[in-house]
Amino acid sequence: MKFAVILLFTLVVLAVASESVEEDTREIDVEEFQEQQRGCADLRQPCTKGDDCSCCGSDGVCNCEHLHKTGCFCKTAGPYEKLKKWFKRCPKY
């Protein structure tokens, strides 16, 4: 009998906890997320010099060394560049 009461109590606590977690995930500010999306550039788009976080995703880094173009553009990162960007803790878009 004690086991059944403890099991029932545990299930109620888990149900309440999972509802609060679901509510927290639903409260993501959509406007803030869209602003962050606009704050980064896709591959082959202009980016901020020296700021790899200005390129979206973990695969994009800012490259300012081009033979035929002036300016800085996002390019696909190599393994070292991905690791370097990961250590910067850039927001994930």
Curated annotation (Swiss-Prot):
Protein's cellular compartments: Secreted
Positions of the pro-segment in this chain: 19-38
Modification after translation: Contains 5 disulfide bonds.
Tissue expression from the record: Expressed by the venom gland.
Gene Ontology molecular function terms on file: toxin activity
Range of residues in the leader sequence: 1-18
Keywords, comma-separated and alphabetical: Disulfide bond, Secreted, Signal, Toxin
Family listed: Belongs to the neurotoxin 31 family.
Name of protein: U12-lycotoxin-Ls1e
Species the sequence originates in: Lycosa singoriensis
